[in-house]
Amino acid sequence: LRLANMPDTLRLVAKYHEHQEKVMKKTHLLIIDPQNDFCDIAGAALPVAGANADMQRLAAFVDAHAARLDDIHVTLDSHNPVDIAHASWWVDSLGNPPVPFTVISQDDVIAGKWRARHPDAQARSAAYVRQLSQAGRYALLIWPEHCLIGSWGHNIQVDLMGALNRWARSRMEIVDYVTKGSNPFTEHYSAVKAEVPDAADPSTLVNTRFIDTLARADQILIAGEALSHCVANTVRDIAANFGDDNVRKLVLLGDCSSSVAGFESLGADFVTEMTARGMRVMKSTDY
């Protein structure tokens, strides 16, 4: 190759790389709360029917498409025993705690039906349920203690954990783990922000690093538990921060996510809402 031809050669190389960047789309996999406590297996605190099979299908998907997955993000529900959505936080007029799946409304707190067990937390707890109501968020629901930090229930489902580690080793990449839920004064369904953000706690505010990382992807595959709650809220918040033009990047792997029993309509409403905005839904086996 003569030196005189070098500028033309460099231009051709630059055009080739520009073309490759356009052709080689970045694909990210977002896995929401794939933890033992949400799987329908022995010992789970809050089992979601079908979740274990969801995670097994997802593990097979990761193994089958490892070379096509440029980044994997895994959110982890991470709670303390003492939490505003746990029974130990509240008592009735007789001093009894609520049973799991009790709904505590603003009117209930005003009427004295429920109060914070610790007197110092009463004003903030009352303000919390009021803010939920004003913002049109889910009503406060008392959940069984789940995904306690450091517990077996907090761990990732075993088949998926193996697949994630195989992906990391084969690609020489690090799985991006995103924790949420350790602030006891607010629920944190969404991995993007808490139900009622706490200005004094950055972990409850919009996770701009997470959003910015996802924004660099051309396609974001979504899976995890539960479709009705943490998946729905996370994806809605991602879409709100992306803008409508980028919602088309989102692809829900419909056979890798299930709703909490009794809340199936929330999951269905979420899918209807987001597909109308451009999100696609497909089976992991059709990818």
Which residues make up each language-model segment?
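Short Gly/Pro-enriched loop/turn and capping motifs at secondary-structure junctions
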Residues: I220, A226-H229, C256-V260
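Short, positively charged and aromatic/hydrophobic N-terminal segments
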Residues: N5, T9-R11, K15-Y16, Q20
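Histidine/lysine/aspartate-rich catalytic loop segments that bind and position anionic ligands
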Residues: G162-L214
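Surface-exposed cleft-lining segments at the edges of enzyme active sites
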Residues: G43-G50, L141-S151, N183-S203, A217-E225
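Gly/Ser/Thr-rich loops at beta-strand to alpha-helix junctions
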Residues: H79-P81, E225-V231
